[in-house]
Amino acid sequence: MPKLSLPAEAALAAAGAAAAGIAGSATALRSPAVMRRLNDWASRRLTDAQRADRYAAILPTPLSGPGFYADPIDLTGLVNGDVIRVERVSPRIAVPGISIRRFMVASTDTAGNPVPVTATLVEPRRPWRGSGPRPVVVRNQPINSLGLKAAPSHRIGRGVFIDMPPFLPLLLARNYAVLLPDHEGPRMAYSAGVMAAHAVLDSVRGMTRIAPELAESPTVMDGYSGGAIATVWAAQEQPHYAPELRFAGAVAGGTPTDYALLHRSMNGAWGAGLFAAATIGQAREYPEMVELFGDFAFHLATLVKDYPQPPLAAAGLARIDLDVLAVIPEPFESPIAQAVVGANKPGASAPQMPVLLYHGSRSKLLGDQFIPEEGVTELVARWRDGGATVEYRAVPGEHMIAAGAAMPGVLRWMRDTLEAER
């Protein structure tokens, strides 16, 4: 697909309506007659290959060319965490005083099938002067994207990696090692909890193989928003998926925990673009979801399948109600959707590591406008009922302000938690 300017990318959510001669407004899309015209318009634009395999058509475009990401990747005989390949990375914009390695390991997807996952290990060159081995922070960056070029391992080598919230430079300044998993997995399954957990935990396993001096390091996980999905699921899955791994704790903020809540707060509102992207991401792990896509929705999915976060978020300006794009009324209430929602709601089992959860709260100021606080407070209660040690902090601000407001406290919690392991 040709490279588009950001305004052009952001406008693509309404491009089909414009091409059909219909105003691309949320109100217009609720008309059955309008949707029939849009579906007819989109159907004529689908290729034979897209019609033949609708699931394959929404998968991200593979990264082409020889090198680290090249196929074929033979997983025969490998166990989770086995290293497939590793290479040193020299970013286009040099960062003095650090060493960067990206690596690929064997893992499993949501259905238990073998898949490769990738991660990046960033280490200060300065010797660790503290007691014991150098601490490690597993930094689950909010990727919130659908294309493989948005994965941290790919972006960091091109000097375009952006940390949000900006913890990475602060962690490196403390002389910690930082592991950046590509937690959306090989299909960029944005928001799929089990896939994210496996990617994170197998990345940690792989890290201990390529850097054995870190195998006994005190380790914490961290993530915000989309990265918090990976963090809470990795914390929950660790006792039975990777029981040999030890973590001092996990901290997550702005955590989406319940897609029933997100359906009410984001669908048809300013968050509709990212909610739509998360729907596509889930469909990549649950192929049966594609059955719910009308032709117009499916055609849009094929157009945005490689998009990074900014244009996906900007598409929320259209405030499209995804329900009207489905082939059935009230698709969110369908057995397919409800099964996926249930499978991606954490809380069924409790982590064994201490956990800090924080969230923008109306009780402090504003409150998170996209991700309702009640979802995370329910998770706190469920995990505590399961015997977990969970601290909850309500912080001031909406979704973005809360991330920054919590940074000092989160950094202190990380420091204290890592030091308690010595």
Regions found by a protein language model. Name each.
Residues 386-422:
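Catalytic active-site module of serine/aspartate enzymes centered on a nucleophile-bearing elbow/loop
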Residues 15, 19-118, 123-126, 384:
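Catalytic-loop region of hydrolases
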Residues 351, 357-364:
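Short beta-strand/loop motif that positions the catalytic acidic residue
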Residues 205-273:
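Primarily recognizes the serine-hydrolase "nucleophile elbow" in alpha/beta-hydrolase
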Residues 109-173, 182-184, 368-370:
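Short, surface-exposed "cap/lid" segments of acyl-processing enzymes
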Residues 362-390:
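Active-site-adjacent alpha-helix of alpha/beta-hydrolase-fold enzymes
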Residues 163-167, 190-213:
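Alpha/beta-hydrolase active-site loop
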Residues 38-74, 255-350, 367-370, 376:
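Accessory cap/linker subdomain of secreted extracellular hydrolases
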